[in-house]
């Protein structure tokens, strides 16, 4: 697994598990909003009033609606934030 994937997965998983609202900016400038429902290597399922499958290669930036604590290597991510 690549180093980039080791950063993406915990970040997206935290957003998914904590139901954090996100703004996703695409490379063409379009802004999508919702919550991360699920994700895999290539896509993110974004849920709002409808579900959208967003291809990762089309994403420029993901902005959480509130600060999130992303677990580092060796952490389970289940403990409370300090």
Swiss-Prot record:
Protein keywords: RNA-binding, Stress response
Q: Known CDD domains for this protein?
A: Hfq
Oligomeric state and interaction partners are given as: Homohexamer.
According to its UniProt entry, the protein's GO biological process terms are: regulation of DNA-templated transcription; regulation of RNA stability; regulation of translation, ncRNA-mediated
The reply to whether S-adenosyl-L-methionine figures as a keyword in the UniProt entry is no
- MF terms per GO, please? RNA binding
Matches recorded under PANTHER family: RNA-BINDING PROTEIN HFQ (PTHR34772:SF1)
State a GO cellular component annotated for this protein: cytosol
Q: What is this protein called?
A: RNA-binding protein Hfq
Stretches assigned to the Sm domain: 9-68
Q: What's the stated role of this polypeptide?
A: RNA chaperone that binds small regulatory RNA (sRNAs) and mRNAs to facilitate mRNA translational regulation in response to envelope stress, environmental stress and changes in metabolite concentrations. Also binds with high specificity to tRNAs.
Q: Which InterPro entries does the protein's record reference? A: Hfq, LSM_dom_sf, Sm
**Record family assignment:** Belongs to the Hfq family.
* Classification via PROSITE patterns: SM
